[in-house]
């Protein structure tokens, strides 16, 4: 078989959707759903996510250089979908979805209390 060149894209399926919580450090927090997330290193712990520059959360991440990955459950399916299709420019997703902000140990971005793993 001859080699093929494919356009950039996601070739590893399935990828879990994760909810990423962010802050701008000035009292504004947001949640974005991403499907492109992965482990980069375990020591020190590092993960990667892919966020388009046009997304509301992008500038927050660039400004603070931090975020929290929040794993989802079946119970969080609606919230996970909602956070992927609604912009934080228009709605406070924590308030709208009645999600609990919890203080993280090492970053300023809040954790989602309902997520089983942050």
Predicted regions span which residues?
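Active-site-proximal mixed secondary-structure blocks
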Residues: 1-34, 38-118
């Amino acid at each position: 078989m001859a080699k093929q060149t494919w356009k950039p894209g996601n070739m590893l399926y399935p990828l879990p959707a994760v909810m990423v919580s962010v802050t701008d450090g000035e009292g504004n927090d947001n949640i974005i759903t991403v499907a492109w997330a992965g482990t980069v290193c375990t020591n020190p712990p590092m993960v990667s996510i892919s966020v388009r520059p046009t997304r509301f959360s992008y500038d927050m991440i660039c400004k603070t250089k931090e975020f929290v990955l929040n794993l989802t459950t079946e119970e969080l399916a609606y919230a996970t979908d909602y956070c992927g299709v609604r912009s934080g420019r228009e709605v406070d997703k924590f308030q709208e979805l009645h999600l609990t902000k919890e203080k993280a140990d090492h970053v300023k971005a809040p954790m989602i209390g309902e997520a089983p793993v942050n």
